[in-house]
């Protein structure tokens, strides 16, 4: 399934989950939710790419919410179809 049909919605959910963890401090629940989201993406190639990126960057073993947050920002920016959609990291405040 083409990410242009569901991509923005999924990215919104990912960043909502991260923001919620910033409020409640439950990083383990956040990581479980994020892994569930990524491992059930409707595009097999997207699912594989995101899962490999998470594993290669030790996201699931990190206890630093901002490391996880900025990882997903970088992943988003790497996958943005148009540079105008990229997130300017210099304007992002830590959680």
From Swiss-Prot:
Q: Where in the cell is it found?
A: Virion membrane; Host cytoplasm
Intravirion side: which ranges?
A: 1-8
Q: What is its EC number?
A: 1.8.3.2
Function summary: FAD-dependent sulfhydryl oxidase that catalyzes disulfide bond formation. The complete pathway for formation of disulfide bonds in intracellular virion membrane proteins sequentially involves thiol-disulfide transfer between OPG072, OPG128 and OPG088.
Q: Which GO terms describe its cellular component?
A: host cell cytoplasm; membrane; viral envelope; virion membrane
Disulfide bonds listed in the record: 43-46
Lineage, highest ranks first: Viruses, Varidnaviria, Bamfordvirae, Nucleocytoviricota, Pokkesviricetes
What molecular function does GO assign, one term?
A: thiol oxidase activity
Query: Where do transmembrane segments lie in this chain?
Result: 9-25
Q: Which Pfam family, any one of them, does this sequence belong to?
A: Pox_E10
InterPro entries reported for this sequence: ERV/ALR_sulphydryl_oxid_sf, ERV/ALR_sulphydryl_oxidase, Sulphydryl_Oase_FAD-link_ERV1
Q: Which reaction does it catalyse?
A: 2 R'C(R)SH + O2 = R'C(R)S-S(R)CR' + H2O2
Residues on Virion surface side: 26-95
Assembly notes: Interacts with OPG128; this interaction involves formation of a transient disulfide-bonded intermediate, allowing disulfide bond transfer.
UniProt-recorded name of the protein:
Probable FAD-linked sulfhydryl oxidase OPG072
Q: What's in the keyword line of the UniProt record?
A: Disulfide bond, FAD, Flavoprotein, Host cytoplasm, Late protein, Membrane, Oxidoreductase, Redox-active center, Transmembrane, Transmembrane helix, Viral envelope protein, Virion
Write out the similarity annotation: Belongs to the orthopoxvirus OPG072 family.
PROSITE patterns in the record, alphabetically?
ERV_ALR
